Amino acid sequence: MDSLDPRNRPVRKVFTTRAGGVSQSPYASFNLGDHVGDDPQAVASNRNRLADIIGLSPDKVVYMEQIHSNTVTVIDEAPADGQAVEATDALVTTQRGLALAVLVADCVPVLLSDTDAGVIAAVHAGRMGARNGIVAKTIAKMEELGAKPSRIHALMGAAASGANYEVPEAMARDVEAKLPGSIARTTKGTTGLDIRAGLLRQMLSLGVQMIDSDPRCTIEDEDLFSYRREGTTGRQAGVVWLPKEA
C-alpha cells in the first residue's frame, strides 16, 4: 500500500471551488446548493459529478438544510429519500463510506475528524451559528461518541476574512462577546469580523491542537462563490468521510 496515496488516508477532506460544473450564470459553474434558485437539474448534475470525483455514490453524500442554528445532528445513514437532513448546521457520524457535506458562500466550513475513534463531523459555522457555539457543541457531540479533543483534526475552509467582512460595530461586539478573537478591522478601517480567528481561539481553548485553515477569502477570491460579493450566487462545499476499509 502506498502511504502517500491520498486514497489510503484514514480520513478524506475536500473543498470545492466554483469551477468544473454545468450551472449557468450567476451560479456558474459548480454550484452545489439546491436552495439558491439554480436549475435543479444542473445542481443534480454537479452533485453527481462531485460524488463521482470523490469515488462515492451520490446517495452516500449527505447534505444539510442549513438554518444558521447551533443544532448538531448525529446520523447513521443517509436519509432514505435522498433529501437533506432537516434543520441542522452540523452533522456527525461514525459510519464509514458516508460523506458529510457543508455548503457555504462566505460562512466557515469546518471539517472535524478523530480517526482513532472513527468520528467525523461537518459544520456550517456562519456568524450566528459560530456566535452560538455550533463548533463547540459539535466537538462535545463527537466526545460523546469517543473522540478526544487532543486527537481531533480541524480543517477550516475558505470564508469571508476579517479584512473584507464589514459589519456594524454593535454586531461585531456582540459576536466578540460570545466568540472572543473574532472582531477585526477591515482594509477600509471599519469594524469587521474574522470568524475563523474566533473559531481558532475557541478550538484551542477546548483542547483541539491540530487545526489547519484555507487562508483564502471568499469575498475577494473570484474562484469562489461569495454571497457578500455577488448576492445571488452558488455554493461551494466542504466534504469529509471515512473511507471503507479494504
UniProtKB/Swiss-Prot annotation:
Its cofactor is Cu(2+); Zn(2+). It holds the Pfam family Cu-oxidase_4. Gene3D superfamilies: CNF1/YfiH-like putative cysteine hydrolases (3.60.140.10). Zn(2+) binds at residues 68, 107, 124. Keywords: Copper, Hydrolase, Metal-binding, Oxidoreductase, Transferase, Zinc. It catalyses: adenosine + phosphate = alpha-D-ribose 1-phosphate + adenine; S-methyl-5'-thioadenosine + phosphate = 5-(methylsulfanyl)-alpha-D-ribose 1-phosphate + adenine; inosine + phosphate = alpha-D-ribose 1-phosphate + hypoxanthine; adenosine + H2O + H(+) = inosine + NH4(+). Purine nucleoside enzyme that catalyzes the phosphorolysis of adenosine and inosine nucleosides, yielding D-ribose 1-phosphate and the respective free bases, adenine and hypoxanthine. Also catalyzes the phosphorolysis of S-methyl-5'-thioadenosine into adenine and S-methyl-5-thio-alpha-D-ribose 1-phosphate. Also has adenosine deaminase activity. Homodimer. Belongs to the purine nucleoside phosphorylase YfiH/LACC1 family. This is Purine nucleoside phosphorylase Cgl2154/cg2365. It comes from Corynebacterium glutamicum (strain ATCC 13032 / DSM 20300 / JCM 1318 / BCRC 11384 / CCUG 27702 / LMG 3730 / NBRC 12168 / NCIMB 10025 / NRRL B-2784 / 534).
